[in-house]
Amino acid sequence: MLKDLYKTQIVPSLQNKLGYSNVMQVPKIVKVCLNMGLGIRGSDSKVMNSCVRDLALIAGQKPVATSVKKSIAGFKIRKGFPIGCKVTLRNNKMYEFLERLIYVVLPREQDFKGLSINQFDGCGNISIGIKEHISFLEVDYDKIDKILGLDINIVTNAVNNKDAKLLLMEFGLPFIN
């Protein structure tokens, strides 16, 4: 499991590579946030229910429905309009999800060559977009109404992008350069 790998191999390795004197200075993954945005399709309760069901299967816990905070006439949306769903994973469920992401989902993703350094936000967090949520084995292809995208945000406590990239490379995430 990735949690055991982190404690036994990744922490000592990163401590040597980054030159930290204390184990607590080594960066770690704090949480993983999953988000499915539906846009205007969120008004259809059938699509919204399937989105919540699929994200619950993928994450292993119940997602929260997100709604519009401010009305925008140009986008034809009103305040309180359902627009997607999200879930935050921590601790054991986070490591289980990362293991499935690294070893199952990313290899199944079409045209995936690796992650780019441009996907980092400057503070050590990375955002990954999955074009088709059917890449996850938990989602039954026969029961889905529509193929949706999925946003994955991996939040670390790393000081900069370089440290976060080293951490994620130790976990096995593939990078282009």
UniProtKB/Swiss-Prot annotation:
This is one of the proteins that bind and probably mediate the attachment of the 5S RNA into the large ribosomal subunit, where it forms part of the central protuberance. In the 70S ribosome it contacts protein S13 of the 30S subunit (bridge B1b), connecting the 2 subunits; this bridge is implicated in subunit movement. Contacts the P site tRNA; the 5S rRNA and some of its associated proteins might help stabilize positioning of ribosome-bound tRNAs. This is Large ribosomal subunit protein uL5. One of its GO terms (biological process) is translation. Keywords: Ribonucleoprotein, Ribosomal protein, RNA-binding, rRNA-binding, tRNA-binding. GO terms for cellular component: ribonucleoprotein complex; ribosome. Belongs to the universal ribosomal protein uL5 family. PANTHER family: 60S RIBOSOMAL PROTEIN L11-RELATED. NCBIfam families: PRK00010.1. It comes from Ehrlichia ruminantium (strain Welgevonden). GO terms for molecular function: rRNA binding; structural constituent of ribosome; tRNA binding. The gene is rplE. Part of the 50S ribosomal subunit; part of the 5S rRNA/L5/L18/L25 subcomplex. Contacts the 5S rRNA and the P site tRNA. Forms a bridge to the 30S subunit in the 70S ribosome. InterPro entries: Ribosomal_uL5, Ribosomal_uL5_bac-type, Ribosomal_uL5_C, Ribosomal_uL5_dom_sf, Ribosomal_uL5_N. SUPFAM superfamilies: RL5-like.
